């Protein structure tokens, strides 16, 4: 699909690229915001957007710093999830969107959604949290998976090797072999991420300030409903996301003691299940959006 990208200059003087896709027959359609993974510019959602608009939802997408046509800060180490959430708030103001029907976030886009909901309550209706870690590697006491990829990109002067490494984390070799055209499409989109963009977004993921666990309950207080989605093959994320789900549910329960927060495991899917398990993913989200 052809994607006409708009550019907004933020108060920080950075540029955020974005696309708002309307429903032609429904000028006041509820808006679904799609928020991306690291190294996954907004065009990775191209197959999902027509499905959502056919269901009567306008769709807003944006690129994180250094992804697509979004620019980076002068200090690459300065990016945090708080800052990215503020960027999205500016974007919503610019597009005159006072409330989004749903925020669907994958990986760091899901983390941004939780931070946004905690910081700006009652703007997100439904929050869909997909395939996210709950805190930085430092906070988790594990190895820093991001630093080697940054060093690889800097050493080679290209995102080629790093993009391939990430592709192989996202998708199984069997899936890539069976879907060469889609693998090629995704890889080409990934390569529109600059090395600076990759490093500055990794800074948010590596930051000592990145910890969703104390924010989950507050995020739940500021939304109307939530759904958690994780790919079956995405490492140990199902376990970590259950903890986040419980926190969000505690917040939602303050408004409705009988509230339920769904937790869907997408079979045979990896980190970006809207790509490698498209049919299952859109079935799950459209059912939730209609509720």
What feature does the model see in each segment?
Residues 1-33, 54-57, 259-262, 290-291:
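Alpha/beta-hydrolase fold catalytic core
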Residues 29, 37-40, 107:
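Active-site glycine-rich loops that stabilize anionic/oxyanionic intermediates
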Residues 114-156:
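Flexible "cap/lid" loop of the alpha/beta hydrolase fold
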Residues 37-49:
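The serine-hydrolase catalytic nucleophile loop
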Residues 195-256:
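Conserved serine/cysteine hydrolase catalytic core
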Residues 138-144, 156-220:
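Conserved alpha/beta-hydrolase catalytic His-Asp/Glu region
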Residues 236, 263-283:
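Catalytic histidine-centered segment of alpha/beta-hydrolase-like enzymes
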Residues 13-14, 46-50, 54, 58-104, ...:
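Active-site loop/oxyanion-hole signature of alpha/beta-hydrolase fold enzymes
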